[in-house]
């Protein structure tokens, strides 16, 4: 039980970091009228867009690296805690792959950036559905993985298909769903601590 609470706190920190990273990504688009531009790079194959200068890309995308690591830490910590889905924790492989895909997108933008959003969304939909069925988390907390997973499919992907451009401002809003998941994980760790003390 103590280990589970520790892993849930770690997941909370990871998802809070990821959510903050998404919000920081969106900030310039919301308030500074930033324009989303494609970085300098070239297509190696028809669907692999590699950035010209990986070091400059890494320096410019440090927040994306932290966000990706936060998503990875959150998913791995859920795996270790066995929550919120109990024995079906193999479903967490999908959001782990999404986090790794986002990490690779720092250098190889296509196909890894959209694949990261898709895998994180799909993975959290699967985890969210399993969380609702497992009923390990109580109240509103059990729905938070599903909210994080549905966000790109309800908001980001439709806008991408309608406008033909990456919806950078909306991608930033995804941070609120990840922060909500981090808060739910933190509160669940406190519930476990309270049960231990009783």
Outline where the language-model segments fall:
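Hydrophobic, aromatic-enriched alpha-helical segments typical of multi-pass transmembrane helices
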Residues: 2-198
């Amino acid at each position: 039980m103590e280990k589970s609470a520790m892993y849930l706190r770690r997941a909370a920190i990871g998802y809070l970091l990821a959510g903050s990273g998404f919000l920081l990504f969106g900030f310039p688009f919301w308030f500074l009228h930033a324009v989303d531009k494609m970085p300098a790079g070239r297509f190696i194959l028809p669907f692999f867009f590699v950035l010209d200068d990986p070091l400059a890309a890494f320096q410019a995308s440090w927040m994306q690296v932290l966000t990706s690591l936060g998503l990875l830490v959150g998913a791995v910590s859920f795996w270790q805690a066995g929550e919120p889905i109990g024995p079906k924790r193999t479903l967490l492989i999908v959001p782990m792959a999404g986090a790794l895909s986002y990490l690779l997108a720092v250098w190889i933008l296509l196909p890894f950036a959209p694949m990261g959003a898709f895998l994180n969304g799909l993975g959290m939909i699967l985890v969210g559905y399993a969380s609702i069925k497992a009923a390990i988390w109580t109240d509103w907390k059990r729905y938070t993985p599903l909210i994080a997973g549905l966000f790109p499919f309800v908001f980001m992907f439709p806008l991408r298909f309608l406008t033909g451009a990456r919806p950078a401002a909306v991608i930033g809003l995804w941070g609120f769903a990840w922060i909500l998941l981090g808060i739910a994980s933190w509160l669940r760790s406190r519930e476990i601590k309270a049960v231990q003390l009783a």
